[in-house]
A protein has these predicted regions:
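Terminal accessory/targeting
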Residues: 1-46, 58, 62-72, 183-240
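Active-site beta->alpha N-cap acidic-glycine motif
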Residues: 30-121, 125, 133
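Catalytic domains of cell-wall/extracellular-matrix polysaccharide-remodeling enzymes
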Residues: 59, 105-214, 219-234
Length: 240
């Protein structure tokens, strides 16, 4: 009886050890909460423009959820109606949401009134869905000038890695361009309206996880790098 009990206890000890090792090998499970200790690992932020589009954005959210990865979505205002459930899902699953203008307009070419219709109108729509107004701004085409900076009333986020996924709809090429250029602190630009971009994004996540990278939202990336985001200031990335 004693030997059997020892063997049984030994079996369960090995089983629990195996489970523990397996758990540590899994992809990241959560985004660090504000105030938590800084992460000692290379960090990047995945960002997606021009959504939401129901088919592709939903697939992307599924893939990110499976991997425990947060991203930042810069939405087009006129595409919000009918996709409110996706936006709520983004919020619930730990993603960050930003403004990409109501109609994807060059903000540098607009009067103050037209700027408000493009940016403040979308901010109001998001407020009605999420109950808050603190959204980052990414101007379409990366178009920024002094007037945009003055009118933004929020931090302006561009990017530091652009695989031009809109130009060549090829998941292999998009993945390659990102992996050849990405570094700790980068903000990666993609578009969640293309199936090839969704595929490339998830490949990039899997490959960079294997290399020890972790993924965070734009605001969390800035915090981890010791940068306080300021209204009207332009940020392209957070490399050291």
């Amino acid at each position: 009886m004693g030997r059997f009990w020892l063997r049984k206890r030994g079996f369960w000890a090995l089983f629990l050890l195996f489970c523990g090792l397996f758990a540590f090998s899994r992809p990241q499970a959560a985004v660090p909460a504000e105030g938590e200790a800084l992460i000692e690992a290379p960090l990047v932020a995945l960002t997606f423009d021009d959504g939401p589009r129901r088919s592709t954005t939903a697939d992307l959210l599924d893939g990110l959820q499976e991997r425990g990865v947060p991203a930042t979505f810069f939405l087009i205002g006129e595409q919000i109606e009918g996709t409110e459930d996706l936006i709520k899902r983004m919020e619930e699953e730990g993603h960050q949401i930003g403004i990409h203008s109501y109609e994807h307009r060059w903000l540098t070419a607009l009067s103050a009134a037209d700027f408000a219709r493009q940016v403040d109108r979308e901010r109001q729509l998001l407020y009605e869905i999420l109950g808050r107004e603190d959204f980052l701004l990414r101007p379409p085409y990366g178009g920024v000038d002094a007037a945009v900076e003055k009118r933004a009333n929020t931090p302006i986020v561009l990017w530091s890695v652009d695989p031009e996924d809109w130009k060549e709809l090829d998941a292999d090429r998009v993945t390659q361009r990102i992996l050849e250029n990405v570094e700790d602190g980068d903000v990666i630009l993609l578009h969640d309206i293309y199936p090839t971009s969704v595929e490339a994004a998830l490949r990039v996540v899997d490959t960079l996880h294997e290399k020890g990278f972790l993924f965070v939202t734009v605001s969390e990336l800035a915090r981890q790098k010791g940068i306080e985001l300021e209204n009207g200031k332009v940020y392209r990335g957070f490399r050291g």
